[in-house]
Amino acid sequence: MAYIMLTLLIGMVLGVISVASNPSPYFAALGLVLVAGVGCVVLMGHGGSFLSLVLFLIYLGGMLVVFAYCAALAAEPYPEAWGEWSVLGSVLGYLLLVVGAGSWFWGGWYEGMWVPVDELIEFSVVAADSGGVALMYSLGGGLLVVSAWVLLLTLLVVLELTRGLARGALRAV
């Protein structure tokens, strides 16, 4: 199980690197879908099956629609692929950054970090992942509303910046 989790975590880091190198909106959206899927599988591996399912459905329902809308508005006839030299340079830079940070912080910090969700399930009335979701929506409701407004504002700012002084990459709809 440890090797499967290590493989999933490496896949998640590589997916985040593919999103951060951001060659084109199309490839970035694909990378984000892969990172969300692998992250939800990591959550399921640690016992949070309900939370990972809810997060994945929210991601597919909300964020993928936003990415499809942005990709439809981005008029890019020749998108940059991952095989081009500029993108490969940024991918190698991010890989070196991850390896350097991992070697710098290597030590015993990870021993208490990977505790399964239902380790003390005998003493609990509610399952830990559904109780955590209820707590997130009850006490963190205001933060969720603020986060949604910030995401909407970010979308509008990005769409305005791509337009620029002239038409830019924004097509007339």
Curated annotation (Swiss-Prot):
Keywords assigned: Electron transport, Membrane, Mitochondrion, NAD, Respiratory chain, Translocase, Transmembrane, Transmembrane helix, Transport, Ubiquinone
Topology term for the membrane: Multi-pass membrane protein
The EC number(s) this enzyme carries: 7.1.1.2
Domain of life, per lineage: Eukaryota
Location of the protein in the cell: Mitochondrion membrane
Disulphide connectivity of cysteines: none
Membrane-crossing residue ranges in chain numbering: 1-21, 25-45, 53-73, 87-107, 139-159
GO cellular component terms, semicolon-separated: mitochondrial membrane
Annotated catalysed reactions: a ubiquinone + NADH + 5 H(+)(in) = a ubiquinol + NAD(+) + 4 H(+)(out)
GO MF, any single term: NADH dehydrogenase (ubiquinone) activity
Role: Core subunit of the mitochondrial membrane respiratory chain NADH dehydrogenase (Complex I) that is believed to belong to the minimal assembly required for catalysis. Complex I functions in the transfer of electrons from NADH to the respiratory chain. The immediate electron acceptor for the enzyme is believed to be ubiquinone.
Family: Belongs to the complex I subunit 6 family.
Protein name, as recorded: NADH-ubiquinone oxidoreductase chain 6
Organism: Gadus morhua (Atlantic cod)
Lineage start: Eukaryota, Metazoa, Chordata, Craniata, Vertebrata
This protein's encoding gene: MT-ND6
